[in-house]
A protein has these predicted regions:
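C-terminal, charged low-complexity interaction regions
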Residues: 4, 13-14
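The −1 position to Zn-ligating cysteines in a subset of zinc-ribbon hairpins
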Residues: 5, 29-32
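Cys/His-coordinated zinc-binding microdomains
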Residues: 10, 34
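Short, non-ligating residues that shape and space the ligands of small metal-coordination modules
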Residues: 15-16, 39-40
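Short linker/helix segments within small regulatory modules
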Residues: 18-28
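N-terminal acidic leader/helix
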Residues: 31, 40-44
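Amphipathic alpha-helical interaction surfaces
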Residues: 35-39, 68
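Short, intrinsically disordered terminal segments enriched in charged and Pro/Gly residues
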Residues: 45-94
């Protein structure tokens, strides 16, 4: 089974791929970083440089804010955002 990974934070349990074949966002919120595909990146396809910049800026802010889970009451037991970021090749010390 293919995992649907958030390109912003590496969360690997998105319900659908973040973007469709044409590059449009799926309008899902990432449960981890709260990025809203198709809204926070509206007007850009997945391959657009602006989309990658938006992802990077959102990620940097999320990390700076302490990598909070979208809803603290629903945060998975043993969730580790530092390990999660490795899903997208981001290595940070923790």
């Amino acid at each position: 089974m293919t995992k649907n990974i958030c390109p912003v934070c590496g969360y690997d349990e998105l319900r659908e791929p973040a973007y469709d074949e044409d590059g449009g966002g799926n309008f899902e919120y990432c449960d981890s970083c709260r990025f809203h595909f198709g809204y926070h990146d509206r007007g850009y396809g997945i391959e657009e440089p602006e989309t990658h910049k938006i992802h990077q800026e959102w990620r940097e802010k999320w990390i700076k804010d302490g990598m909070p889970w979208r809803d603290e009451d629903e945060k998975p037991f043993n969730w580790n955002p530092i390990n999660q970021l490795r899903n997208i090749g981001i290595i940070i010390s923790g």
